[in-house]
A protein has these predicted regions:
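Compact, glycine/acidic-enriched structural inserts
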Residues: 96-134
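Charge-rich, low-complexity amphipathic helices
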Residues: 40, 44-52, 98, 120, ...
Length: 217
């Protein structure tokens, strides 16, 4: 559990737009993780890695995904792999349907028809009896995954990697999401026949870690 939820007007306005079950959960546990950090729900926190507001700022990581990071979605949590749990803004409040945005493509699909069902089937279930084989393998390899880190595949699936825990490493969660956006943008904009020869890390002008995908000439 995180620090106590503050009672500022700004926080109250934020909670007022959320599904009532999520708002109630934040009043009890202001951001939390289960299954050794493999599943996270953000709160209103000092640390930007678990802060609902910071995580959704465009300049944090969403910028790297461009239009794929649909601003109508509030990313309220994630798996340690970077798949995003999200709520959709309907114009006056957030719809009480939980969506999942895939870490590799940010493709969207509804996964639970209410936040209450999400808590029961995704969070409580993973807290009590986790069963996702890759998540279990990650916990066996890494132990607890800190909430400020994600587990990433090297190379990415989009660069020809394959999903095996032996090819996974832990890095800062913001960096992981930025790298994912950089890879996605490079791959979808490259000619179909372009061959990837490597990646080059770099830092942008405000200090954010970036990744450049290098294609064969």
């Amino acid at each position: 559990m995180g620090e106590a939820l503050d009672d500022s007007d700004q926080t109250e306005r934020l909670l007022a737009g959320l599904p009532s079950v999520y708002a109630a959960a934040l009043r009890i546990a202001n951001g939390f993780t289960v299954h050794s950090g493999m599943n996270r729900v953000f709160g209103v926190r000092e640390d930007r890695h678990m802060d609902l507001r910071s995580w959704n700022e465009v300049e944090g990581w969403r910028f790297a995904w461009g239009e794929k990071a649909d601003p109508s979605f509030l990313m309220f949590g994630e798996t340690a792999f970077g798949d995003q749990y999200a709520l959709r803004w309907t114009g006056s409040s957030y719809e009480d349907v939980v969506y999942l945005l895939d870490v590799n493509l940010l493709s969207v699909r509804p996964i639970f028809n209410s936040f209450a069902y999400f808590l029961d089937q995704e969070i409580v279930q993973n807290a009590i009896s986790p069963s996702h084989p890759t998540a279990l393998a990650c916990v066996e390899k890494f132990g607890r995954v800190p909430f400020n880190e994600n587990v990433v595949l090297t190379p990415s699936l989009l660069l020809g990697g394959y999903e095996d825990v032996s090819n996974m490493v832990k890095i800062d969660s913001y960096a992981a999401m930025i790298y994912g956006g950089d890879i996605y943008t490079a791959v979808v904009s490259a000619p179909d026949e372009a061959a990837v020869v490597g990646v080059e890390p770099w830092v942008d002008d405000i200090g954010r870690p970036r990744l450049r995908v290098v294609f064969a000439d």
